[in-house]
Amino acid sequence: MPGPLYGRDLLSIRDLSSEEVWLVIETARQMKLRYYAGERIIPMLKGKTIALIFEKPSTRTRVSMEVAALQLGATPLTFRRDELQLARGEPIKDTARVLSRYVDAIAARVFKHESLEEMAAYASVPVINMLSDLEHPLQALADALTIYEKKGHIKGIKVVYVGDGRNNVAHSLLLVIAKLGGHIVISSPKELTPRKDILEAAQLAAKETGATIELIEDPAEAVRGADVVYTDVWVSMGEESLAEERRRLLQRYQVNEKLMSLASNNAIFMHCLPAHRGEEVTEEVIEGPWSVVWDQAENRLHAQKAVLALILAP
């Protein structure tokens, strides 16, 4: 009997209930155990084909999604936007309908979240968000897996995101921790707080799970006693024209040894990568004893295998 995610789109963490987030985490844990037991290929998706569309460059997402598909027995077909007729003006709705006749799922990394929504509206196969300007759900699911592995639980864990609080990673992290009953703090300048609709969705989830949400402008105050300190780049892809303004606003939000010293004694540091050493994080922190970024990056593979299996395996 198909599970609760079978055949569904995944555009946002908002698409998942708390129980479904836990299902992804537990499935990912089992996938990872089997991987390290030597079961590298689990042919649950044998005969399936997955189209991967990239409007933005990618290292972790592209490689981990291709490998995830291959390890599940599926065939990934990877396209840059300029390799498709999208680049010559074909409407997204036409591309979505055509690809649906050839493949079993479409995953896309796009500049505008609206592109994903249009794709999902017209595709007759599941559509998966590999990153948009609004959210990065696959990253957040891998992050939740990482925190669970490192801390043994998530309920009540204090997770502090420091930096640009309205970027895609911050949005998805806020939502996933709220759905899992954690204590999520977003520390950012008032100009860069989370989008109102995302914050309201997180607050609604928190009412059900007992999670707590805080917006704290002062990073030192925010990080005090943190179990997890998380940051991301100050200038997201597509926002390069705002670089000077972002650096001015975020200068005091750098995660350095002084800031980490305010966190709990066993705090961990997380970053979705790529990192700009000397900007949002120092070399000493990302290469230091707090850092779990390489385990976090690996967990993209296991979390995405779980997502693909749950959506595509009947």
Swiss-Prot record:
Cellular compartments annotated: Cytoplasm
SUPFAM superfamilies: Aspartate/ornithine carbamoyltransferase (SSF53671)
One of the GO BP terms on file: arginine biosynthetic process via ornithine
EC number: 2.1.3.3
Record keywords, A-Z: Amino-acid biosynthesis, Arginine biosynthesis, Cytoplasm, Transferase
Residue sites binding L-ornithine per the record: 168, 232, 236-237
PROSITE patterns tied to this protein: CARBAMOYLTRANSFERASE
A Gene Ontology molecular function term of the record: ornithine carbamoyltransferase activity
Annotated GO CC locations: cytoplasm
Binding residue positions for carbamoyl phosphate: 58-61, 85, 109, 136-139, 272-273, 300
Recorded catalytic activity of this chain's protein: carbamoyl phosphate + L-ornithine = L-citrulline + phosphate + H(+)
Recorded metabolic or biological pathway in which this protein acts: Amino-acid biosynthesis; L-arginine biosynthesis; L-arginine from L-ornithine and carbamoyl phosphate: step 1/3
Known function: Reversibly catalyzes the transfer of the carbamoyl group from carbamoyl phosphate (CP) to the N(epsilon) atom of ornithine (ORN) to produce L-citrulline.
Alphabetical list of PANTHER family matching this protein: ORNITHINE CARBAMOYLTRANSFERASE, MITOCHONDRIAL, ORNITHINE TRANSCARBAMYLASE, MITOCHONDRIAL
Family from the record: Belongs to the aspartate/ornithine carbamoyltransferase superfamily. OTCase family.
Protein name stated in the entry: Ornithine carbamoyltransferase
Native species: Hyperthermus butylicus (strain DSM 5456 / JCM 9403 / PLM1-5)
Lineage: Archaea, Thermoproteota, Thermoprotei, Desulfurococcales, Pyrodictiaceae
